């Protein structure tokens, strides 16, 4: 399985899910995949491989120890939310459509309640990336591991030398699940200034802090609901209210830095 646990998702997904559950419990949302390589063609085998991995998502479990880890580390979200998440039917295959269009380009849409559908994105993306790599013959067993690890160590050494703090945000763009494990193992062992991991599964596996707060998608949703004039302000206001000022890293580049800073002065 490419996705190994119900905890293998990015931190900000639980934050945004909880916000939407509190503010828009009945709102339905549609996500649409956009390949940033327009014109790239796939075959039916790729579609079947995607569907197989998507089917496996519904089989994922969240163990009691993982849930306890999440309750402790997501201290700004009430514990009952993770009790709900442990048993919720998040990855219902009836919510997703995958197909090839008339140009053999990959298409994917997911529709469900907003606080559920958000989890799909950062599982679909690593599945797509790994299967695409396999389709092109780029697999872990064929890579030059020593050369690749040397590149990782160069970045770690740079961080250590200059005391540069960083977080690991590799899930959505990773080469493969096995490779993320390898990289995170080295970061854990050698990096002095890694402050956290956005992949909760990896953070739990390695005993790291979780890292991350929100994504552009939440501002996009608010702008769709309230319009551009009010959406940014409402998003920041609700975020601060729901989390009582915690989870306080806010994105300022969705509609422009000047507009974002202006909205902060009116809270």
Name each model feature, range by range.
Residues 1-231, 240-241:
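Ordered alpha/beta subdomains of enzyme catalytic regions
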Residues 236, 242-267:
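Catalytic core of soluble alpha/beta enzymes
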């Amino acid at each position: 399985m490419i996705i190994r646990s119900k905890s293998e998702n990015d931190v900000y997904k639980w934050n945004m899910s909880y916000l939407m559950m509190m503010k828009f419990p009945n709102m339905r949302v549609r996500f649409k995949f956009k390949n940033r390589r327009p014109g790239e063609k796939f075959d039916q085998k790729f579609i079947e491989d995607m569907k197989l991995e998507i089917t496996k998502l519904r089989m994922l479990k969240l163990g009691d120890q993982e849930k306890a880890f999440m309750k402790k580390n997501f201290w700004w979200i009430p514990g009952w939310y993770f009790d709900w998440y442990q048993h919720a039917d998040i990855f219902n295959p009836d919510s997703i459509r995958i197909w090839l269009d008339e140009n053999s380009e990959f298409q994917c849409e997911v529709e469900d309640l907003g606080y559920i559908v958000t989890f799909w994105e950062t599982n679909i993306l690593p599945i797509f990336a790994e299967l695409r790599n396999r389709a092109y013959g780029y697999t872990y067993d064929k890579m030059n591991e020593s050369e690749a690890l040397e590149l990782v160590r160069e970045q770690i050494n740079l961080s250590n030398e200059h005391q540069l703090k960083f977080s690991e945000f590799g899930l959505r763009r990773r080469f493969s699940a096995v490779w993320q494990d390898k990289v995170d193992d080295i970061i854990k062992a050698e990096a002095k200034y890694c402050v956290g991991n956005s992949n909760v599964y990896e953070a739990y596996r390695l005993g790291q802090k979780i890292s991350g707060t929100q994504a552009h998608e939440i501002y996009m949703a608010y702008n769709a609901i309230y319009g551009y004039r009010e959406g940014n302000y409402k998003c920041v206001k609700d975020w601060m209210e729901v989390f009582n000022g915690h989870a306080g890293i806010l994105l300022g580049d969705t509609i422009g830095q000047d507009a974002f800073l202006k909205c902060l002065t009116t809270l």
